[in-house]
């Protein structure tokens, strides 16, 4: 009751009139009901009702009982673009019982198992996104109001970033008012592409923040006449958007990280536990791709061969191999510092709740089985021929959604991390792949219409 009264006072102080009870569907898309602030008690005790059959991947039919979204008071987030409204991340219940098809609830289940093993999973996610415009015929282009963001290598370029600074400052100020600790923002490697970095925290809070970040970018971008997209690869000749994951485990009692060890014989400053966790991630990497790169479009980003230099900037900045190394951005997993890993495969469109649940389960399997990731790769993976890659025994990441889903179906650890969501996810993704195969693209028409 004390927490309830405290949030009631905060709502009054912030002049909040409306609440959003918000959860995500299987794709990670935010779903909400808006209720007046006077309904706070009902949102805590019962929740806002939803017909689950209207939501992707909710495991319900039109005959099913309502899903009720009960708000998590610790997730209180005023909307910077709508000051009289606040969002609460929510967990789903059906008939008074916690509903396992809820991605947030599922992540909490997995994190509870991690805590029981003595650890806290701490994560930083780096969301890249594009600002685009869309013409009446449906074609898109990078948002470029001053026609200056046209360089082949626009990364970090002042003139390319300048037109977007008002948008980026608006977004950064909004997030920092919420206590996120945004510490840097930059123009990324593609025209109209940006990255915002905010503080490390526990995995559940990070997933809540990434979800809200997507909500915020979509609304703030509208003020500037742009569409914010978290699609992995909106342009064939531009670098794709990732959601790079920085991760480590901390001791549940002390809060101290357990991945750092300066006596590391491999020279990366990592502990035995860190290497076992890493071994688990690499062991399950191909199945993880289905969850962390969950759309057809994601595999235009995780591509092999000549595609490595097909981007205007000359590089994809995206790995295609199951590998780890030192501070080396051609690897799947980069060791950014002692005990500090970054996974570069994760795509911007990842559902963070499902992605992080699968990810930590893979790592914990590595700890349980004491898996060894082998020696780090210290060279430029982009410079190696496919023959060299194959000869070294290095696995290649899935090159299509279908291939990734095949790997997921065979991987009990990753499937178990998704719980009952796994079968629903696999079914939907197979349908997505079949729908994609049935499409006739503009490229096919251009290539073959008068070819014969």
Across the structure, where does each feature detected by a protein language model lie?
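Glycine-rich, acidic/polar active-site loops that bind/position phosphate-bearing ligands
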Residues: 1-452
């Amino acid at each position: 009751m004390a927490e309830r009264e405290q949030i009631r006072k905060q709502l009054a102080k912030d002049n909040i009139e409306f609440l959003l009870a918000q959860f995500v569907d299987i794709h990670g898309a935010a779903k909400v009901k808006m209720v007046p602030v006077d309904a706070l008690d009902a949102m805590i005790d019962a929740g806002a009702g939803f017909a689950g059959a209207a939501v992707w991947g909710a495991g319900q039919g039109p005959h099913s009982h309502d899903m009720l979204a009960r708000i998590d008071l610790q997730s209180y987030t005023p909307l910077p673009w709508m000051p009289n409204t606040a969002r609460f991340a929510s967990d789903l219940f059906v008939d008074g019982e916690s509903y396992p098809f809820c991605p947030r609830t599922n992540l909490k289940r997995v994190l509870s198992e991690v805590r029981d093993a003595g650890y806290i999973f701490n994560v930083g996610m780096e969301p890249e996104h594009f600002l685009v415009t869309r013409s009446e015929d449906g074609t898109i282009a990078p948002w470029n109001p001053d026609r200056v963001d046209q360089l082949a290598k626009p990364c970090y370029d002042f003139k390319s970033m300048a037109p977007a600074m008002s948008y980026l400052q608006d977004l950064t100020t909004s997030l920092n008012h919420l206590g996120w600790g945004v510490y840097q923002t930059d123009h990324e490697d593609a025209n109209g592409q940006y990255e915002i970095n905010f503080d490390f925290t526990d995995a559940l809070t990070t997933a809540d923040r990434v979800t809200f970040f997507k909500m915020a970018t979509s609304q703030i971008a509208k003020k500037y006449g742009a569409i914010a997209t978290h699609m992995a690869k909106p342009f064939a000749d531009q670098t794709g958007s990732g959601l790079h994951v920085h991760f480590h485990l901390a001791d549940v009692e002390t809060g101290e990280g357990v991945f750092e060890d300066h006596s590391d014989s491999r020279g990366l400053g990592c502990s035995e536990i860190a290497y076992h966790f890493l071994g688990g991630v690499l062991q399950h990497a191909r199945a993880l791709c289905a969850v962390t790169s969950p759309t057809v479009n994601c595999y235009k980003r995780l591509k092999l061969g000549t595609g490595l230099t097909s981007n205007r900037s000359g590089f994809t900045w995206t790995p295609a191999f199951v590998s780890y190394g030192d501070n080396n951005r051609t690897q799947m997993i980069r060791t950014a510092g002692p005990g500090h890993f970054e996974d570069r495969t994760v795509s911007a469109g990842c559902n963070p709740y499902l992605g992080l649940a699968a990810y930590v389960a893979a790592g914990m399997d590595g700890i349980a089985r004491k898996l060894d990731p082998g020696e780090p790769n210290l060279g430029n993976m982009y410079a190696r021929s496919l023959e060299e890659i194959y000869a070294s025994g290095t696995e290649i990441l899935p090159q299509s959604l279908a291939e990734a889903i095949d790997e997921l179906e065979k991987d009990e650890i990753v499937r178990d991390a998704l719980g009952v969501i796994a079968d629903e996810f696999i079914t939907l993704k197979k349908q997505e792949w079949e729908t994609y195969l049935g499409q006739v693209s503009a490229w096919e028409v251009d290539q073959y219409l008068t070819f014969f």
